[in-house]
Amino acid sequence: MIVEERMRTFINSLDAGNTPFLDELECSALSEGVPIIRKEMQSFIKTLLALKKPQRILEVGTAVGFSTLLMCEYSQPEMHITTIENYEKRIPKARENFRRAGCESQITFLEGDAGQILKELSGAYDLIFMDAAKGQYIHFLPEVLRLLK
């Protein structure tokens, strides 16, 4: 998300911050060069979750699980996330982060190519968050639209 500096400052001023676990995970990911969502996107997602109160969320692109856990933390307790990751080096780290956060029961973690997995999913999702290979979004779109409630 590209945002002008004044708008970024305003958006970030409205956010009370994250939990210590998420702050630690964010610092760790950034120090290891793992791309995670920026502060203003974190604020936007928290606002969207508060307004929409989704029960079923689909995330395409898990990385180390930062945004997955952010959505777990700031969603309704009965919410469930299905998240997809293809990069083998990040899968164990994401699993470990889900375990450390105590959110495993809220998360279905699917490993593999999102293009194929999306075709196999059924049911409707209240919210779909895409944070994967940007060049593939156009190919994911038909399946994402089919799955979006």
What are these regions (language model features)?
Residues 1-127, 134-149:
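A short alpha-helical cap/connector motif
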